[in-house]
Amino acid sequence: MLAKKYTGKKLVDNIFTISRKAKEAIANHGKANVVNATIGSLYNEDEKLAVYSVVEEVYRTLPPEDLYAYSTNVIGEDDYLAEVEKTLLGNDYKESMKGLYISSIATPGGTGAISNTIKNYLNAGEKVLLPNWMWGTYKNIVLENEGVVETYELFNSNGGFNLEDFKNKINEISKTQESLIVIINEPSHNPTGCRMTYEEWKDVYTFIKGLKINLILIRDVAYFEYDDRTEEEKNKIRALILDLPANILIMYAFSLSKSLSIYGMRVGAQIAVSSSEKVIQEFKDALSFSCRVTWSNVSKGGMKLFAKIMTTPELKERFLKEKNEYMKLLMNRANLLMTEADHVTLKYFPYKSGFFVTIPIGPNVDKVIDDLQAKNIFVIKFNDGIRIGICSVPTYKIVGLAKRIKDSIDKF
């Protein structure tokens, strides 16, 4: 009975499967004796979900009409979308980006933003260019929309962004396609925590501005709140898009799941930036149509929560202060893991910020994972490496973790 395009499709979710094993181990051996590095949410040192006190306080004081009513607009609340744009593009973006057309739509999380973009800009049978180290759901979104997955090597031999392979893949696909969707997940890349430099971004934008095809660049910025770039550094990168040609569309995928630690509320946004008024009008027309027929509208409570915090100076200050403490916690955990990894010569991908550190293993990755599970250490497999969720592992459990991983690798 299934439609042909859905026949044979089945969700295989490695993350939830391993997480279930970790929970079983905790039930059998006690939480103190298990390292559960599978969780992709921010946890405190007591291994409980990190909840911002200001978020909890504001949410519980929202009026009922903001919590339980439909959104006043299919594309999202006006005050929410205005604050999303300021957060991503800078408070003065209307002045600094005067020559560009910008529009945004509320989505159910960052997943909704990416899915809604690919649905509307991908033709069946076309390739979508993804990084070879990536969040696996990207692939499923492409496949659901009858696309073909192509990957570029994320890292070069020096651990930097592999511009050469990125360019080669785009040039090759350009020979057979008039339009191409590309995803760059940065900063705080999932699963590696890597971050591109200003120079790397400059090289990317210089290259794509010279393309003849239509290029839709999805900037997955789900974890950007946990990046420690200064506002000056962010503005330098933002300025690189000021002279976009009309055939380039930048699409930011934003998520409140990470920004406010409200994963279950499913609130995000997609922000389109173009030098073409026509391109942005197409975005408004087509994507609002997709919103209405797919999820109708997004949680009004989550949107009002973000807008209230961001537009109230005292609340925003409290939020930023709490966020900085969590950023310090993440960096302390990451630095501890990397320092101990260096001591035992355990390789890892270059981490700058975010929730995860990834260790390349090689062909024995499955054996290593099994051996770690025998030690009650649970990690997530990515390609031929393992992802460590430093976001959820308390600092005391990170002590000695690098050596235990290295010992498992050295067995095979």
PLM feature spans:
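PLP-dependent enzyme catalytic core of the Aspartate aminotransferase-like
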Residues: 2-3, 12, 86, 90-97, ...
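N-terminal small-domain helix-loop-helix segment of the aminotransferase-like
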Residues: 11-108, 412
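Short beta-strand
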Residues: 34-36, 73, 253, 347-352, ...
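Conserved PLP-binding catalytic core of the aspartate aminotransferase-like
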Residues: 44-45, 319-372
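Conserved core of the PLP fold type I
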Residues: 66-213, 224-244
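Conserved core segment of the aminotransferase class I/II
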Residues: 83, 242-324
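Short Gly/Ser/Thr- and Asp/Glu-enriched loop/turn motifs at secondary-structure junctions
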Residues: 99-101, 350-356, 381-386
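Generic enzyme active-site microenvironment
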Residues: 218
